[in-house]
Amino acid sequence: PIDTALRAEIDTLNATIYANINNGAYKAGFSSDQAVYANAFKAYFRTLEQLETRLASDGRSFLTGSHFTEADLRLFPTLYRHDPVYYIRMKLNGARILDYPHLWRWLCRVYALPGVEQSNSLVHCRQGYFGRSWNQTVPLGPLTPLSYPEAYNHPNLFKFP
């Protein structure tokens, strides 16, 4: 964007999302050291909390406001895979994205953008992360409250208390 303040905001978000979410999932999932795993796990969920707060603060639709940006694009793949794949495979079982109401609605909003649903395949993701493992067993869940990716079509699955 021409707006230098917006560009700086996107760049800052991109750096945080890459370090703690995109790469953070792999740091946690492929770590063979408990301390490295714990640090990556904590940074991942701390960043999810920060993003949840950001989306909740003023009811914004996307990370920087009312428009989809590069920061949203960077965050989407990891959050799309979190509940059905990374929760188990990457040992990121601190919470589901469904447990964060604003992130969940954001995820469903991005999934509903033209072409996004058609461009993603959880079958492919599950095969890639689980089918190539030592026993080639691919988990079937999660199945509640709905199976994935069908759940992404229901932004109101999360019920505020």
Locate each region found by the language model:
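C-terminal alpha-helical interaction module
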Residues: 1-161
